[in-house]
């Protein structure tokens, strides 16, 4: 029998963003979207401002969408999640705990300096020391420069996911010189080796980038990319309709329904690795009892949440990671069984149930999800 995962409720969300016709849905939107429209500026709106443009300082979506235009990594992932060469042109594994990367020659940072192995060593060691992203590189215990274009990375034990982890958007390769000179201000004036270089950041409003003519994969076809911070979803939708915006992210509810049949736009929708879930403190009673947690899992039906709150833009999950993530195991999902849930609660010492609180923030999606969960949990 397949082992069931003990998380209460998880939903794999769909990535949603809309582009005006002629754009592209590649993950480097700025490098491709709008290339066939004749425009020299692409305006992208998302629902929150970036936290930092320093890739080692935060791991949030609004920041990452901008930073992926500014920086490159040693590795990239293709559409199937398979590691592909990026700044590392090739690699070899002399043993199970060592990987040697051979770097591309002639890669320029936005300050004009050539990328060298010393920059890679500096960047990986900086990420390892950063509280926000160090967990991504857990297991790496050494980075050594062999020559200007060769780096050796060693791990404490065999690490199957190391190439995938080095492709993470936060594990960007920085210019040691530019980063050191900028100090704490690097996140507001970043220097990378990506297709776009930083121009300005009007906090709370917009980040402006321009194409880097010396990019190692060739200059991007759209000269300028502007990331707008537009908190209200309706205002993002209106901006797309009026032509003020070319791409909008974070689309939910009626706006999705309204726009997806409009032939002027392309809705790009696909599975994300993020989850919406109900969590609890397993060190405190009654949630320290596995039978209580399992009872709650059996009490929940994810379908009404997906259909009502997410308007179908999601699917029930059986794990805290999605099927497009390395290491995913296709284990059996929980399905709602009220009688079984009641029996488990009784076995745990709560034949009449117990009172509980669901804490949520002001996000309407989470609030609406909590209301449905409240109704379902009342049944046990």
Sequence positions of predicted segments:
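Aromatic- and charge-enriched surface segment that lines or borders ligand/interaction sites
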Residues: 89-130, 146, 152
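N-terminal lobe/hinge region of extracytoplasmic solute-binding protein
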Residues: 45-94, 125, 191
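Surface-exposed binding/hinge segments that line
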Residues: 92, 96, 135-178
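A structural "hinge/loop" feature
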Residues: 48-64, 87, 113, 157, ...
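Ligand-site clamp/hinge motif
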Residues: 212-257
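A bilobed periplasmic-binding-protein/Venus flytrap-type ligand-binding module shared by bacterial periplasmic
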Residues: 210-213, 272-295, 299
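Append "and occasionally in soluble cytosolic enzymes with long acidic Gly/Pro-rich linkers
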Residues: 288-375, 379-380
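Gly/Pro-rich hinge or "lid" segments in bacterial periplasmic/extracellular proteins
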Residues: 82, 167-219, 224, 339
């Amino acid at each position: 029998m397949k082992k069931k995962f003990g998380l209460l409720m998880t939903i794999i969300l769909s990535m949603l963003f809309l582009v005006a016709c002629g754009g592209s849905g590649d993950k480097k939107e700025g490098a491709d979207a709008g290339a066939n429209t004749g425009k020299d500026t692409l305006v992208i709106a998302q629902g929150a401002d970036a936290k930092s443009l320093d890739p080692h300082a935060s791991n949030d979506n609004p920041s990452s969408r901008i930073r992926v235009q500014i920086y490159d990594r040693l590795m990239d992932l293709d559409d199937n999640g398979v590691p592909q060469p990026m700044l590392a042109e090739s690699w070899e594994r002399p043993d199970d705990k060592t990987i040697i990367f051979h770097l591309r020659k002639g890669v320029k940072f936005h300050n004009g300096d050539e990328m060298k192995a010393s920059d890679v060593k500096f960047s990986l060691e900086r990420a390892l020391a950063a509280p926000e992203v160090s967990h991504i590189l857990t297991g790496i215990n050494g980075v050594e420069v062999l020559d200007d274009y060769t780096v050796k990375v060693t791990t404490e034990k065999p690490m199957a996911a190391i190439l995938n982890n080095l492709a993470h958007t936060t594990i960007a390769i920085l210019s040691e010189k530019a980063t050191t000179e900028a100090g704490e201000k690097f996140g507001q004036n970043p220097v990378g080796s990506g297709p776009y270089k930083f121009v300005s950041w009007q906090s709370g409003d917009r980040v402006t980038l321009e194409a880097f003519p010396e990019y190692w994969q060739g200059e991007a076809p759209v000269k300028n990319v502007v990331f707008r911070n537009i908190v209200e979803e309706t205002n993002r939708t209106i901006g797309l309709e009026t032509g003020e915006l070319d791409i909008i992210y974070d689309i939910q509810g009626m706006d999705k329904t309204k726009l997806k049949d409009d032939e002027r736009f392309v809705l790009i929708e696909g599975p994300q690795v993020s989850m919406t879930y109900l969590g609890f403190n397993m060190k405190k009673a009654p949630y320290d009892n596995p039978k209580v947690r399992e009872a709650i899992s059996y009490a929940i039906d994810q379908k009404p949440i997906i259909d009502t709150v997410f308007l179908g833009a999601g699917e029930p999950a059986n794990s805290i990671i999605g099927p497009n993530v390395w290491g995913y195991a296709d284990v059996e999902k929980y399905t709602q069984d009220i009688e079984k849930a009641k029996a488990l609660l009784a076995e745990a010492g709560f034949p009449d149930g117990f009172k509980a609180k669901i804490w949520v923030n002001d996000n309407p999606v989470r609030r609406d999800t909590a209301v449905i969960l409240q109704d379902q949990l009342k049944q046990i």
